[in-house]
């Protein structure tokens, strides 16, 4: 794309690095996406790319869990329904400060489901780098300390698997990590509670 795709995830999607992913009651196409999380440390509005990284406090691992049915078929090209479900935003385990990460554009990342390799990549292949993203998003909204921008995912998501897509189901275990930022482990569980 010419410009970054921007969507919101609800606060209720945020969980810890090792918390469960709870499938929505009508889930049929819940997918995984390892992403680099960029945590804003200083208010940013109309920031130039050359100054963008001065507004970053640090980085973390994010699993941008996505229900593709909600995202693609029930949203009229607005992705938030499919990406903002409860528990669909595991972050952490740590916020690693920028002084510890010399180059956010050269971090290996990986994700496995039930011990099987699904995603392998490096942040150097991102379509838009961290500075590009901070500068671009700051044109449209004020970024506040604590805001998190996630940066896109490498190949290997379930909907892209051949010969046919694979999606998460109750009982699956997702493990993922980024070099220098730690690892996550989530168990996938069926919906619990009231509809």
Task: Locate each region found by the language model.
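Extended, compositionally biased flexible segments
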Residues: 1-25
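Short, structured patches in soluble enzyme cores that scaffold and shape functional sites
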Residues: 9-11, 32-42, 60-65, 95, ...
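Active-site/binding-pocket entry motifs
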Residues: 13, 20, 44, 67-68, ...
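A generic local secondary-structure boundary/capping motif
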Residues: 21-30, 44-51, 79-83, 97-101, ...
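RNA pseudouridine synthases
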Residues: 40, 48-62, 68
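Catalytic-pocket segment enriched in acidic/His residues
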Residues: 68-195
């Amino acid at each position: 794309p010419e410009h970054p795709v921007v969507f919101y995830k609800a606060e209720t999607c945020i969980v810890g690095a090792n918390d469960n992913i709870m499938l929505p009651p009508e889930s049929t196409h819940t997918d995984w996406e390892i992403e680099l999380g960029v945590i804003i440390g200083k208010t940013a509005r109309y920031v130039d790319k050359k100054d963008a990284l001065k507004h970053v406090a640090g980085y973390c691992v994010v699993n941008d869990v996505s229900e593709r049915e909600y995202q693609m078929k029930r949203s009229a090209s607005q992705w938030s329904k499919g990406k903002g479900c409860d528990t669909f935003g595991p972050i952490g385990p740590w916020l690693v400060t920028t002084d510890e990460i010399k180059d956010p554009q050269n971090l290996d990342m990986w994700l496995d489901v039930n011990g099987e390799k699904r995603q392998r990549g490096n942040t150097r292949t991102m379509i838009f780098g961290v500075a590009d993203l901070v500068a671009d998003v700051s044109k449209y909204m004020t970024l506040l300390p604590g805001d998190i921008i996630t940066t896109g995912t490498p190949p290997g998501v379930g909907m892209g698997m051949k010969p046919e897509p694979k999606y998460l189901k109750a009982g699956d275990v997702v493990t993922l990590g980024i070099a220098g930022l730690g690892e996550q482990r989530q168990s996938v569980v069926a919906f619990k509670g009231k509809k």
